[in-house]
Amino acid sequence: MATSMIPIFVTFMLVAAHMALADTNMLQDFCVADLSNGLKVNGYPCKDPAKVTPEDFYFIGLATAAATANSSMGSAVTGANVEKVPGLNTLGVSISRIDYAPGGLNPPHLHPRASEAIFVLEGRLFVGFLTTTGKLISKHVNKGDVFVFPKALLHFQQNPNKAPASVLAAFDSQLPGTQVVGPSLFGSNPPIPDDLLAKAFGAAAPEIQKIKGKFPPKK
């Protein structure tokens, strides 16, 4: 009986694979996100096309540098993703501006849903990412340079200079998502047990508690 089911299972898998590859392109001109709708199915539902306006495709927030004075890391990220530009819904792209104070850092983090390419607007940065084998790929980049961070790999940008710096970052996702290493591990809600982190990092529990004190849990 089990043997007789194999051809049926194989046929089902082939049909499913074909379905997964079908209609990969958009089936309408656009699908402006209806941010007021609580329903989410791997994205936002479409806004009524009759109610779409030019403002749905427009964002002015990247025109000027963001304030970095209140950032403990000396950096500020201004995102233009689907939550700020509803017209990006289903388009698979977004953009951000990152500003760095002198000595500023965009700490080690990853984007689980996107690769990233940065274009240096001003200044000089030390940037890099870690491969899954632990190799550091890093370089100093200058104004006008481009550097790429592969999807879901840990990466960072540091401004080691005495002048501000800024970049534009492009993503192949309308909502890349961001996980910063420090806050994710030491500021989770509910918290990761101290003994677990102590063993993972080869540290004593009091040291873990001290580090956690620097990362208040997100509400």
From Swiss-Prot:
GO CC term, one of those recorded: apoplast
Pfam families named in the record: Cupin_1
Keywords: Apoplast, Disulfide bond, Glycoprotein, Manganese, Metal-binding, Secreted, Signal
Chief location of this protein within or outside the cell: secreted
This protein's record includes keyword Isomerase: no
Disulfide bond positions: C31-C46
InterPro entries in the cross-refs: Cupin_1, Germin, RmlC-like_jellyroll, RmlC_Cupin_sf
Signal peptide location: 1-22
Location in or out of the cell: Secreted, Extracellular space, Apoplast
Keyword Aminoacyl-tRNA synthetase (UniProt): no
Domain (Cupin type-1): residue spans on this chain: 60-209
Residues of this chain annotated as glycosylated in UniProt: N70
Gene3D superfamilies to which the protein is assigned, alphabetical: Jelly Rolls
PANTHER family, per the entry: GERMIN-LIKE PROTEIN SUBFAMILY 3 MEMBER 3 (PTHR31238)
Family label: Belongs to the germin family.
Job of this protein: May play a role in plant defense. Probably has no oxalate oxidase activity even if the active site is conserved.
Record's protein name: Germin-like protein subfamily 2 member 3
Organism whose genome encodes this protein: Arabidopsis thaliana
Gene name linked to the record: GLP8
